[in-house]
Regions:
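Extended, compositionally biased alpha-helical segments that mediate assembly or anchoring
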Residues: 455-506
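Active-site recognition of the HExxH zinc-binding catalytic motif
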Residues: 328-342, 369, 374
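Bacterial N-terminal signal peptides
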Residues: 8-21
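N-terminal helix-rich structural modules
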Residues: 30-162
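Contiguous, non-catalytic segments that form substrate-binding/exosite surfaces or channel walls
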Residues: 111, 124-322
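Long, well-structured alpha-helical subdomains associated
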Residues: 374-470
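Post-HEXXH active-site segment of zinc metalloproteases
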Residues: 341-367
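An active-site-proximal "capping" alpha-helix that borders the catalytic cofactor pocket
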Residues: 152, 362-379
Length: 506
C-alpha cells in the first residue's frame, strides 16, 4: 500500500477534510482502495432544538447499521446471494420452485419487508418488525423522542409515523408524510429502501439512513427542473405505451450536506444522491424526492472523477470535465428514476417492473437513470435551460463517469450498469480508443444518437417486463474490453471510492 498524495490534497483543500488513510491495491473496488475521509459539515446555524433532534437521529441511524449488518451476511450458515434475507444455502431455483408450488405464500415471501426462514419443510415470511425487533424498538424510541423535541409539524408527523412503521411493518403512511417535510433544514431518510443487497431475487429492502442538512439556496436553484418532469416523460424516445404519466408531480429537490449515514448507505460505493421512496403507490400519489449530497459529491469529484478524466480522455476533452456537469448528471439521474415504466401489465397481470425483472431490475434501473439523465440534460439544452454550447462538457463528464463507476466491478449494480453503457456506446461509435494517446476520443454526434438509442432499448425492455430480454441485453453489452481494462489499470493510484467518517454528534 502507498499513500495517495494528489487526491488527498485536492480533498483537503476543497472540503476542509482531513484524510485519515489512503491506500491502493490492484483489485478493482477493493475496500483498501477507498479514501477514508473525515467529513466536516457546517452546523453552526442549527438551533438548540434542531441540534438535539439531529443527535437523536444520528443514534437512530446507527440502529439501521446494526440491522444491515444482519441483512448483508447470511445468519447461521454459508453466505450466498440471498445473504441474510433468505435461509443459508438457499438457491434462486429452490426459492422459485417453492413459490410455484405454494402460490398462496408468494405475496408474503416476496414482500419487500419480510425475511424468509425455514420451518421444517416450509418457508415462512417473518416481518422485519419481528426479525429486527430489538434494533427497531430502539430506533422507534429515538424517533419518538425526536418527535417530541421538534416544533416543526411536518417533521414531528413524519418521525411519529416512522416510529409506528418500525413497530407495525407498514411504511405507506410514513412514506407519504416524508414527502411533505417542509420548513426545516433537517432532511432525514431512515428505514428499509433499496433492494440491491438482495442479489438473489432483488426484492428485499435493506435498512439505511441519511441524516442531512438542506441548503435552501442551492436547492432553489435546481428546483426549476422538476416542472419539466411531464415534458421529459413525453420526450422519451419510445412509443407512448411505454411512457408513464401516472406518477405524482410533487417531486421535491433538495441539495444537502450529509452529516451521518447508516446501514446500506455506508456499504460499498457511496451514493452522491438518492431518489425515494421506491413504493410505486407513493410515487403515483406524490412523486419522489430527490436529494443531492453536495459534500459527498464534491469529495468524489475532486478526489476521483477529476483525476480520472485526464487518464481516460484525450487532453482537449479531459479539460472539459466539470463539477457542474457531475452535479447536473446526478440531479437528472435521480429525476430519471421517476420517469419511464413503473406499474405495468404483463400478459393481463398488473405488476411492476421490479417484480418482473427480479435480480436484474436494480442494475437495469441504474443504467437507465445514468443514460436517461444525459438524455434529459440534452432536452434541457433544447429548452434553453442549460447552455447548448456546453454539450461537449456534458459528454466528457458523462464518459469519465462511466469509467469511475465501472471500477466498482460488475458485481455491483452501478458498476455493471456502467459496463453496459460502455459496451453499448462504444459499439455505436460514441467514443473510440486512440492507441497513440492510450485514451478515448468522444464523437459528439454519435454520442447523442447512442444515448437516445440506449434509453429506448432499456425502457422498452422494462415496459415489457422482459426478464429474459434484459438478461440477454446485458450479456451482450455489459463487458469491458481490453482497451477499457488497460485504461482502468492506469487508475490504481486513484481511489475507487471514499469511506466518509462523520462526527459522532453535532
Amino acid at each position: 500500500m502507498r499513500a495517495l498524495v494528489s487526491p488527498a490534497l485536492a480533498l483537503a483543500l476543497t472540503l476542509g477534510v482531513s484524510v485519515a488513510a489512503l491506500s491502493s491495491t490492484p483489485a478493482l473496488a477493493a475496500p483498501e482502495n477507498y479514501a477514508t475521509i473525515r467529513m466536516k459539515t457546517d452546523t453552526a446555524f442549527l438551533s438548540p432544538e434542531e441540534r438535539k433532534v439531529v443527535n437523536l437521529l444520528i443514534q437512530a441511524a446507527d440502529q439501521m447499521t446494526a440491522i444491515y449488518d444482519k441483512q448483508a451476511v447470511a445468519q447461521g450458515g454459508a453466505d450466498g446471494p440471498g445473504h441474510g434475507f433468505y435461509p443459508p444455502g438457499m438457491t434462486k431455483a429452490e426459492f422459485e420452485t417453492y413459490l410455484a408450488a405454494h402460490p398462496d405464500q408468494k405475496a408474503s415471501l416476496m414482500d419487500a419487508y419480510t425475511v424468509v426462514r425455514r420451518e421444517g419443510d416450509k418457508l415462512v415470511a417473518v416481518p422485519y418488525s419481528v426479525a429486527y425487533k430489538p434494533e427497531l424498538t430502539k430506533a422507534a424510541a429515538l424517533l419518538d423522542e425526536a418527535a417530541k423535541v421538534t416544533t416543526n409539524a411536518s417533521l414531528k408527523r413524519f418521525l411519529t409515523l416512522r416510529a409506528q412503521s418500525f413497530r407495525s411493518n407498514d411504511y405507506f403512511q410514513s412514506e407519504m408524510a416524508w414527502m411533505d417535510l417542509e420548513g426545516t433544514p433537517i432532511e432525514v431518510a431512515i428505514g428499509p429502501y433499496e433492494t440491491y443487497t438482495d442479489e438473489m431475487i432483488g426484492q428485499k429492502a435493506a435498512f439505511e439512513a441519511f441524516v442531512t442538512l438542506k441548503n435552501p439556496t442551492e436547492s432553489q436553484a435546481l428546483d426549476k427542473y422538476k416542472a419539466y418532469l411531464r415534458d421529459m416523460e413525453a420526450n422519451l424516445p419510445v412509443a407512448d405505451a411505454y411512457k408513464n404519466f401516472k406518477r405524482g408531480g410533487a417531486s421535491p429537490i433538495a441539495v444537502a450536506e450529509q452529516i451521518r449515514g447508516g446501514g446500506d448507505n455506508l456499504h460499498g460505493p457511496q451514493t452522491v444522491a438518492f431518489n425515494l421512496p421506491n413504493d410505486e403507490r407513493v410515487r403515483e400519489a406524490k412523486g419522489a424526492k430527490k436529494v443531492i449530497l453536495s459534500n459527498v459529491l464534491a469529495a468524489k469529484y475532486e478526489g476521483i472523477l477529476s483525476p480520472i478524466a485526464s487518464r481516460v480522455l484525450v487532453a482537449d476533452q479531459a479539460a472539459l470535465v466539470s463539477q457542474k456537469y457531475m452535479t447536473l448528471e446526478t440531479l437528472f439521474h435521480e429525476l430519471s428514476h421517476s420517469l419511464g415504466p413503473g406499474s405495468i401489465t404483463v400478459a393481463g397481470r398488473a405488476t411492476t417492473v421490479s417484480a418482473e425483472l427480479k435480480d436484474i431490475a436494480g442494475t437495469a434501473e441504474e443504467a437507465k437513470a445514468d443514460v436517461m439523465g444525459a438524455w434529459n440534460i440534452l432536452f434541457m439544452m433544447e429548452k434553453n435551460e442549460i447552455p447548448a454550447a456546453e454539450r461537449p462538457q456534458l459528454f466528457a463528464t458523462y464518459t469519465a463517469g462511466i469509467f469511475r463507476a465501472a471500477r466498482w466491478g460488475d458485481e455491483e449494480a452501478h458498476g455493471r450498469g456502467a459496463a453496459l453503457q460502455y459496451g453499448y456506446l462504444k459499439a455505436k461509435g460514441a467514443f473510440v480508443f486512440d492507441p497513440a494517446a492510450k485514451r478515448y476520443r468522444i464523437d459528439d454526434a454519435k454520442m447523442a444518437a447512442g444515448i437516445r438509442d440506449l434509453v429506448a432499448d432499456i425502457v422498452k425492455l422494462q415496459g415489457d417486463g422482459d426478464y429474459a430480454g434484459m438478461v440477454a441485453f446485458f450479456d451482450r453489452y455489459a463487458h469491458l474490453d481490453d482497451d477499457a481494462r488497460g485504461v482502468i489499470a492506469t487508475l490504481k493510484d486513484i481511489p475507487v471510492d471514499i469511506t466518509p467518517v462523520y462526527p459522532a454528534k453535532v
